[in-house]
């Protein structure tokens, strides 16, 4: 996998499963990403608001606040609405993708994670020009 084109892009990984979290964080760091971790949706919203990552990888089945609600919160906040969010979920039905997009996710990927597919989505979202809100 090629390194990111931006220098040290910051990823917020919101994942409660320790094994998934450690594997993804390790692989992201290995190729040059700075990784911040949150273990539930509420913590993810707080960290995204404080740290302003370049992208959020959001598990949808989270304790305290699920990924759907966390994404809606991020997209409703003018300070975080431009941060791309990729939904990570074990649910692979077409209706699940539609639910993710309706919540405000910019992309959707299923578990188990296909590393190349996920990184293609991450790279595309990080390297797209910012959208104007006007």
Region locations from a protein language model:
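Charged docking surfaces used in two-component/phosphorelay signaling
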Residues: 22-30
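C-terminal output helix
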Residues: 25, 112-122
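Short hydrophobic/Thr-rich beta-strand motif most characteristic of the beta2 strand and flanking loop
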Residues: 32-39, 47
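Conserved acidic carboxylate
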Residues: 15
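Active-site beta3 strand of CheY-like receiver
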Residues: 51-57, 62
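The feature encodes the CheY-like receiver
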Residues: 63, 81, 93, 111
């Amino acid at each position: 996998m090629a390194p990111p084109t931006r220098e040290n892009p910051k990823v917020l990984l919101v994942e409660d499963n320790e094994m998934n979290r450690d594997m993804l964080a390790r692989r992201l760091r290995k190729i040059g990403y700075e990784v911040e971790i949150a273990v539930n949706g509420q913590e993810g919203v707080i960290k995204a608001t404080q740290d302003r990552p370049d992208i959020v990888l959001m598990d949808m089945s989270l304790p305290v606040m699920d990924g759907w609600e966390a994404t809606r919160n991020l997209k409703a906040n003018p300070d975080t609405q431009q941060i791309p969010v990729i939904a990570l979920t074990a649910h692979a039905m077409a209706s699940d993708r539609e639910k993710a997009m309706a919540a405000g996710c910019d992309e959707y990927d299923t578990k188990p994670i296909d590393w190349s597919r996920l990184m293609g989505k991450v790279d595309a979202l990080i390297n797209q020009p910012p959208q104007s809100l006007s």
